[in-house]
Amino acid sequence: MTDTRQDPIDSLVVADFGRGISRAYLLESISGGFRFVAKAEHRTTTDLPYEDMSQGWYNLLRQLEWSSGRGLTVRDKLAMPQLASGDGVDGLLISASFGEPIRVAILEAGQSAVAGPVLDALRRVHTRVFHASAPSSRKDGGWAATQADALRSFQPEMALLIIGAGAQDAMPRLLQLAKQVGMIGTVSRAIVIADGQAQEQGVAALGNKLKVRSISPVVRAPADIAGEIERELGEGFQIRLRTSDFEVIADDAIQAPISRAHAVDLVNRFIARAFKRQVLTIGVDDGAHAHWASGDQGAISALPQVDLTTAITGLTSREVSDATCWLPFESTEDELVTWALNRSIRPWTIAEQPRDLAIEQALARQVARRAVSEIGRTQPMALAGVDLVIGGPVFARWNQPGAAALALLDSIDIVPNNGVVDLALDPDGLMAVAGVVGTIDPTLASSLFEYDALTHLGSAIVIGGATSPGDVACRGEIHFDNGEMAQFSVLSGSVEVVPLKSGESATIVLRPERKFSIGGHPAGKTVTLAEERRIVGGTVGVIIDARPRTLAGNANRAMQVRQWLESVNGIRASTAVRKQS
């Protein structure tokens, strides 16, 4: 690797290599801030007919040169450091998600403080996880056989046995499954995290064909154990990236590449700390990942086996069937399955026709909902506290801010504790870029994020409760800074958008009907959003959402979805008309 770091760094190229699409970003210090200057995007050329990633990389560099009007390369390599003429850059940083994820099986028995930190660590590196917890009930006699079949299908490369307190009744099943691990043939190494006799039994069950080591949770802290496993898998990720064509590129980088999901997670946690927000970021790009953070706490859900491109076939039949509930027209599960199979054959096709856009948006909801549900499973109280939801580039590529806002709302599908959630997009994927930059200079990353990263869509006020569709759910009024005001009403089962432009702020008074409530407030209680809870405008405006929080369809479901989309996309006129108060 090339150490091109200077003090200060005035310019960088950050490369983000994906399975199908790669991007390059030119960043530069401008007027005291570190800014996003240009972006290039091109197919990752690892597959036929090229089978050489450097071909796509050269194309990205040429795009950046054309966009920025400056020379960045010498003989198809980045010119570093930056010259006095302004040509070249001071360094190269890389994030990547194109390698196959490492498949890890976690077999657990009893209660261990190690399990949670280890699972969090695995989500920060490029892995797929098979997690099985052995039951202690005598009625689960077929558990080991069922899990063994699933394990053979998963074909793990690494196994972790975690044995905690109270594991006596579950141990026979765990050991039976551990013996199968040793016989699968794909596992090369294993770690037994246990103490005393349980540790000895776990090592013996895995057999002598594997490279097995043991760690005592009594001697070492859970965070220390998780950190060691994360480092080991991170090194495995680096090895998996070391193809000859990629090494030619990576040798010029300041440091080793990091995974895209980890880079985004670093920025998600920064937002929570710096702006005192409870934030959820959702990405559907080379797999799905959701990131939650609040204060110093955080969680990540990484699902590299499902997305909207090559891994669209990772959707279950139930998820595809449920996707029909998000369509503004009648369709069947078979039609969506056919669409998904066609997408898997042509994974980099851009949806342009209204029908294709609607189907992609519906399936994006299902992918996102699975990733978000993993956060809800590991952090049961987290989602209700979220006050900021950020969507990745896939939500922005539809060029329909209203549809993107609605998709984000449907992905979390909760009534937030305070009734309000802000919605934003990361249209250019700059959260991953800022995360990579932050590993060498947090100040530069902070500047990049605050100036260029997010597009604010607006705020959504979610009304809880339900009656017959068409009944009034809430009445209210919005008071603008310029003295104007508007009154509005929202019907049960509908969405209303109150115009509030970017840069504007307003006070909103909400008067829900007696069977409806705003957040955690009692049903029928008037709520005023003012001062620190004042609403700030965005690209879409203020969304008042009085829809039921359920996927249950009805005969008029497609018509309802069409009306929702027309409201958020500005096709259906708002009932709120601004006038002088």
Question: What label would you give each PLM region?
Answer:
Residues 1-10, 77-97, 135-154, 179, ...:
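Conserved phosphate-binding catalytic cores of ATP/NTP-utilizing and phosphoryl-transfer enzymes
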Residues 3-32, 102-107, 122, 148-166, ...:
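Gly/Thr-rich phosphate-binding beta-strand-loop-beta motif of the actin/hexokinase/Hsp70
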Residues 19-52, 124-128, 298-313:
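Short glycine-rich, Thr/Ser-proximal phosphate-binding strand/loop in the N-terminal lobe
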Residues 26, 45, 62, 250-581:
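Helical "lid/coupling" subdomains associated with nucleotide-phosphate turnover
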Residues 40-68, 136-143, 166-167, 314-316:
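N-terminal phosphate-binding loop and adjacent alpha-helix
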Residues 63-85, 151, 182-186, 271-272, ...:
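Phosphate/pyrophosphate-binding loops at sites that engage ATP/ADP/AMP, CoA/4′-phosphopantetheine
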Residues 75-115, 395-399:
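Short beta-strand-loop/turn "lid" adjacent to the catalytic site in phosphate-handling enzymes
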Residues 192-227:
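Terminal amphipathic helices with adjacent charged low-complexity linkers/tails
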